[in-house]
Amino acid sequence: MKKVLDNHGALRPMAAAILACLAAPLQVLAQSSEQTLPAVTVEGTRSVSDRNQYPVTTESMTADQVADTVNAVTVEDALKYLPNVLVRRRFIGDTQAPMATRTTGINASARSLIFADGILLSTLVNNNNQNGSPQWFMVAPDEIDRIDVLYGPFAAAYPGNSYGAVTEIVTRMPRQFEASAKITTANQQFSQYGTRDHYPSTQASVNLGNRAGDLSWWFSVNHLNSFSQPVTYLTINQSATAATGSAPVLAGAIADRNRTGAPIQVLGAGNLTHTVQDTAKLKLAYDVSPALTAAYTLGYWQNNADASSQSYLTTTTGAPYFGGTGSVNIAGNAYSASGIGSLFSSNSTDQAHWMQALSLKTTNSGPLSWEVIATHFNYGNALTRTSTGPYPLAQSAGPGRIADASDTGWTTLDVKGTWRQKGRGAQHSVSFGAHADQYKLANPTYSTSDWINGDKGALFSDSRGKTRTEALWAQDVWRIAPDLMATIGGRYERWRAYDGFNFATSGSGTGFPVNQPEVSDSGFSPKLSLTWQATNDWSMTGSFGKALRFPTVGELYQNVQTGQSFTQANPFLKPEKVLAGELALERRTSDSKLRVSLFEEHVSDALISQTSSIPGVAVPVSFVQNVDKTRQRGIELVGQKKDVLIKGLELNGSLTYVDARITANAGYVATTPGAASVGKRTPYVPEWRATAVATYKPDEKWSYTLAGRYSSRLYATVDNTDINPATYQGFEGYFVADLRIRYQLDRHWSAAAGIDNLNNRKYILFHPFPQRTLYAELKYDF
């Protein structure tokens, strides 16, 4: 460990904080055979895994913890200090924010699941960091009652997508009339390459709720207005051709190297985004009887976003340059003016999403309980307009393309129940359920003569298809002895992909439609866990689980296009087959927690994006392919302690090491001479991650929080040829510190101020991430 800390200077202060919160004295394990499992606590304080007796390592955040410790503008902010969780939110208001876990990366959105009150927020129409990103915006931070993150595929109630993690967001329902209003402002100071500016954001929300007799309701509205830093940079490969004397001379380009180490010129910034979002949500709950409750949720979200480009290039007169004809002179070398011009574009997005859920569940404490929940998510409107004409004229007019995902959506149905053996000596609690879902992706792109206001023209490309899954599952929690509990379960799933269709337009304008074949698969995933309650404080749990993660519609049928508009769909992808295990030793007291977990995961046919050469295409193309085998193993240390040294000081921390490797990849084709993938690190999984949070509450009014997040660098390619992480499209290691101060003025008013990235770490995770950001918050509770 000393060597590791010496090589990671930023990790030293965080490791010290983590070790401090783990410093509670270790007790010798008692040898009593009469120890029993902990008593059941009040329902409202228990995690989802405790309530359902899932044998899964779980970490949680409550509403009070979020309010005290997190500068939260959107709900995904609440997860930032949980162990081994990274939500790739590039800016406030980002709609492409997938979640990474301890063994899965930020481009693998379908390897984790996000629910809010049983409603699926994960967009399982794809497995990427774009149109596969979760629908976080359907939950407001003020709604949160608690958030639980469950690690690993050890609960039969969840599909194989859970092998990364499951995030369960539980929202509040009022017991009496309540109302609140909050406004949060943020201002980011950003400076990188040729961009130096401030980017503000404002979020305002109003919440109303009440309970009258058997009916309770909650209504909330949220408005977000946000400006982003550059999301992309515009680069061109370094030219080896000397410029002629007649070529116009341009200044402002910045020499750098790309992630493989080749020289490039950075010419500008792209996708500086202004987004305006509104969310409205209604929740109703009605007690049909003392033992039965019906609930309905309706959510609506709309987004209007505009993105533009910035040029660093200037002419000899100082005017900005966006491309043209012929060649130009940059630092003495010749570059194509039209090639430069093709880098600049603008786009606008108009989205409206609807979410509905209907549930019926028992609330009695009898031997049998059950629940039925149906959900539907629909993209009522999802248009993205992009310019293709010359810049900057394209900012106000000109040709372009319109991508329309308006017919995308999904429907889920779950029926589940639990039978609990009652009476003295009861040994079993059996849970069971059935699941069905359908996912639909529609993503046609049309040409248009007016990208801003024009109608759709000729079809340019299309990707569409459907998947359907049916599943049956069961789990038995068996108390073998007073201090020993086994959980045995399994899940059978049947999957089908159908109605796949692709359309592509060649460089000559010829269209190529392809009807893709139907594919299907099925399988059984056993689960086994054993928990030993050694003492009242100490427990040990060993878990094993198999998981099947079936391909999404996007992985099967999504077009892959280069500048030559080439389509490469692969409807014959195989499901990921996961074998995972974890051994967790945990100590819990009234004021502390310590957990050490050893985990290992073997994935066969891992679905990973690779790059290769394809006949007929002059440049390498990225596509999804099954990698034969990957293996991830590691150790995780998590601790929490209240009243450390002084009353009111609480420390939380986590430290994780993961050795993630590709162990077999027969389909690999090297694009760099001498490169290989076997033995290289699994893409997007860092070697080290850590978090540390120190919160001091001297009284009931004030709270002060200082927190830190650390990650080592990671690789994005299967052959690890991206040797330069500190550049656009690279993946750097980082340490960032955050600060928050909150004051409760009285029973109605509270205020908070904070700073994210206090140390102003300038880092890139493919995209440039936010630099130092200031926050201010004011809230009124009725």
Per-region residue spans from a language model:
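N-terminal periplasmic "start-of-domain" segments of outer-membrane beta-barrel proteins
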Residues: 38-70, 95-98, 126, 184
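Extracytoplasmic beta-strand/coil segments of soluble accessory domains associated
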Residues: 76-123
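Short acidic/polar hinge/loop motifs at secondary-structure boundaries
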Residues: 119-153
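Gram-negative outer-membrane beta-barrel transporters
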Residues: 182, 482-486, 593, 599-603, ...
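Transmembrane beta-barrel wall of Gram-negative outer-membrane proteins
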Residues: 196-308, 352-357, 361, 470, ...
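Face-selective signature of the C-terminal outer-membrane beta-barrel domain
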Residues: 285-301, 340, 344-508, 515, ...
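Outer-membrane beta-barrel signature, preferentially recognizing the C-terminal barrel domain
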Residues: 341-355, 360, 461-469, 516-525, ...
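Surface-exposed extracellular loop regions of Gram-negative outer-membrane beta-barrel proteins
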Residues: 438-449, 496-507, 518, 532, ...
